């Protein structure tokens, strides 16, 4: 009996030249935020951009702590110009605070998606992060995806606790119910682990047709951990946040090997929370992931 081949993961609209695969490396603005305050940046966008350039990142993943829908248009355009001059793209935009805070107001963006699309478009980015917490959000997600499609843009939901995307099969069912080709998933293994779900090769293959983006953050789960994650499906889970390059957490070698095997040529975003050492961790995380897989040459666009 033949085994069906998994659907290749693809983010790029065109094949990359001279590359068997060409993942791009993105640095999340989350590393620039204060550890316990997602609304406050501890370093400037210019400093974060310099760190990204110094360490061979292709893009930043933009968050509202630096630039959001609340930011004056002139400031947005100046930020976009600054990133272009540094040769950095923007891999995805999270345009407000309720989405990363995962509050009940997170899905509000779906009801008026235009400002989020405008913000992403200013950065020549076609991917916007959104949030769904209740079944009633699905119809709004369909409308928002339709509006995004008219502008050649896409929406993505992260694997995330306390959302409709906590578990594998329910996530796939929600994607099926939304039923829009431009609405997909940001694969993120740490939240899957917190929710008691497997996150390795079989999961990536299951999610493959829907993956628009990859987020990587790291953690250690143990009873004496300092942090507690509340989930709907797995109760309260103690964990310690650690940097991507630190051992004893998520199995990144398996994840990267699977992405390579599936021909993934999209963006891999280091989504570390700030541990008070953004420059050091950004450098060590990039070096670690490059030791696990081949990435596109620096200077190649995230949308090429």
Residue ranges and their predicted role:
Residues 57, 122-125, 211, 264-265:
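A structural motif
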